[in-house]
Amino acid sequence: MKFFVDSADVAAIAELNALGMVDGVTTNPSLILKSGRNILEVTREICDLVAGPVSAEVVAAKADDMIEEGRKLAEIAPNITVKVPLTWDGLKACKVLTDEGRMVNVTLCFSVNQALLAAKAGATFISPFIGRLDDINLDGLELIADIRQVYDNYDFQTEVLAASIRTPNHVAQCARIGADVITAPPAVIKGLANHVLTDKGLEMFDADWAKTGQTILSL
């Protein structure tokens, strides 16, 4: 399963990338706002840093305008993935852009039917939002499993990119289900290393080692 970083924080992306943890990056208008930077500037910097797909999102509502914005964003770097919303106009834009050979990430997916339409439109990635479904007492992970099954049933090549990842359990369950990709904030990815028993084990080892009176570097 590939790990994408859901962030426009170049320093945070670079830290994870140095460990080989970054297979791609996803951004959106909210993350660009949080970065406080120009979208073209920060996106270009991320593309220079990361070899994998970097999603940059259109903001237009109409298909023709989305297509023009998508083409403009795609000029930034060869690894740009144009992100479009899962609306009828977004699907129209997806079809045109993928026919032109561009990667497209169809975002804000909340149902199997939407995922089917995106795959039929040739989407490179479909982004179902787990956390936002959980917020309204629906099962976001169940949607990931359902899309995985449907795509496998019909051999769709669209990759399932699980988004709105908020917890380590979301990541573990997506891996079990067979999501192709998860995208998560840097803090969530770093948090995957944490476990209470690891902490307790280290405390015990540190206490026992202190009792030996030794230091490894002085041996």
Swiss-Prot record:
GO terms (molecular function) for this protein are: aldehyde-lyase activity; transaldolase activity
Cross-referenced CDD domains: Transaldolase_FSA (cd00956)
Q: What are the entry keywords?
A: Cytoplasm, Pentose shunt, Schiff base, Transferase
The record ties this protein, via Pfam families, to: TAL_FSA (PF00923)
Location of the active site: K83 (schiff-base intermediate with substrate)
Q: Name one GO cellular component term.
A: cytoplasm
| The EC number(s) this enzyme carries | 2.2.1.2
PROSITE patterns recorded: TRANSALDOLASE_1 (PS01054), TRANSALDOLASE_2 (PS00958)
Q: Does the keyword DNA-binding apply?
A: no
Q: Where in the cell is it found?
A: Cytoplasm
What pathway does the UniProt record associate with this protein? Carbohydrate degradation; pentose phosphate pathway; D-glyceraldehyde 3-phosphate and beta-D-fructose 6-phosphate from D-ribose 5-phosphate and D-xylulose 5-phosphate (non-oxidative stage): step 2/3
Enumerate the catalysed reactions: D-sedoheptulose 7-phosphate + D-glyceraldehyde 3-phosphate = D-erythrose 4-phosphate + beta-D-fructose 6-phosphate
GO biological processes: carbohydrate metabolic process; pentose-phosphate shunt
State what this protein does.
Transaldolase is important for the balance of metabolites in the pentose-phosphate pathway.
UniProt record similarity statement: Belongs to the transaldolase family. Type 3B subfamily.
* Name the UniProt record assigns to this protein: Probable transaldolase
- Native species of this protein? Cereibacter sphaeroides (strain ATCC 17025 / ATH 2.4.3) (Rhodobacter sphaeroides)
Upper taxonomic classification of the species?
A: Bacteria, Pseudomonadati, Pseudomonadota, Alphaproteobacteria, Rhodobacterales
